[in-house]
């Protein structure tokens, strides 16, 4: 709990303390350290996190990609682009979202998929509420990019999605893009 609390403080002096424990941590402790470093958004964590990006455990890879996306360092772009091809869908999806927030469109095909209810239905573990939340996040991420395909998909969602919250978020994104 202390580790997570450090991450939520936005106090950069905790970064060296967290980084010191990262190499010797494992399991849930390591995941919490990675998460806390991502919350602090300090570039000093980029290198050590990159070293964990190829971890055999999908949960570790996912947490690393989310944290690297939060930090938004250009040094992480190659690792995040590689993660677009990870065998774990959540890793791919979060890589696309993180890259988009950095203005990198290499995951735009995945963002298009994430804004498609038909695509998300292929994943049984993603329930209706999670589909809606995923679409909302993808809309927000896509709004960082200047991509006509994403724009057209957002426009389509603003007019036709069955969920009012999605239509509203899509319209807000369109207003920002215009």
Task: List PLM regions with ranges.
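Intrinsically disordered, low-complexity segments enriched in Gly and acidic/Ser/Thr residues
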Residues: 110-113, 117, 121-129
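TPR/TPR-like (Sel1-like) alpha-helical repeat modules
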Residues: 115-117, 152-160
């Amino acid at each position: 709990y202390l580790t997570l609390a450090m991450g939520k403080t936005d106090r950069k002096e905790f970064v060296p303390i967290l980084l010191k424990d990262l190499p010797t941590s494992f399991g849930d402790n390591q995941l919490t350290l990675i998460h806390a470093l991502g919350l602090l958004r300090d570039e000093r964590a980029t290198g050590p996190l990159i070293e964990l990006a190829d971890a055999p455990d999908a949960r570790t890879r996912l947490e690393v990609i989310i944290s690297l996306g939060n930090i938004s360092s250009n040094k992480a772009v190659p690792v995040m682009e590689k993660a677009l091809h990870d065998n774990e869908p959540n890793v791919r999806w979060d890589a696309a979202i993180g890259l988009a927030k950095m203005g990198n469109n290499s995951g735009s095909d995945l963002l298009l998929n994430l804004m498609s209810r038909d695509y998300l239905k292929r994943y049984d573990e993603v329930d209706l509420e999670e589909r809606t939340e995923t679409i909302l996040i993808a809309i927000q991420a896509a709004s960082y990019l200047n991509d006509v395909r994403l724009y057209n998909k957002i426009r389509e969602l603003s007019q036709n999605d069955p969920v009012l919250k999605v239509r509203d978020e899509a319209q807000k994104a369109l207003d920002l893009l215009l």
